[in-house]
Amino acid sequence: MTEKIAMTVEEAADFTGIGRNTLRQLISWKTMPTIKVGRKVLIKTQDLDRFLELNRNTDLRNQAEVIPLKGYVN
């Protein structure tokens, strides 16, 4: 089985244990890049891994604490 290079918000939520609404909030705060395909939003697996490592001891529900991925400019 090949590893996915991108996941939907729902797949990322299942994979990480982070709630779908929390992931959507993080995306709306422009903390990580996403890919839009029609109405579907994809998150690259590599970006998700980097984001989680960067925010290891962070409350992801608190925008003031969340560290956006370096180099990600909206």
Model-derived regions: residue spans:
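Basic Lys/Arg-rich amphipathic helical interaction modules
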Residues: 1-25, 32, 45-74
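Short Lys/Arg-enriched helix C-cap and helix-to-coil transition segments
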Residues: 35-41
